[in-house]
């Protein structure tokens, strides 16, 4: 999963 996915 992408790094900018803040726990979404």
From Swiss-Prot:
One of its GO terms (cellular component) is extracellular region. GO terms for biological process: neuropeptide signaling pathway. Keywords: Amidation, Neuropeptide, Secreted. It is found in: Secreted. In larvae, detected in midgut but not in the CNS, ring gland, abdominal perisympathetic organs (aPSO) or thoracic perisympathetic organs (tPSO) (at protein level). In adults, expressed in brain, and thoracic-abdominal ganglion but not in corpora cardiaca and corpora allata (at protein level). The keyword Secreted applies. This is Allatostatin-A4. It comes from Delia radicum.
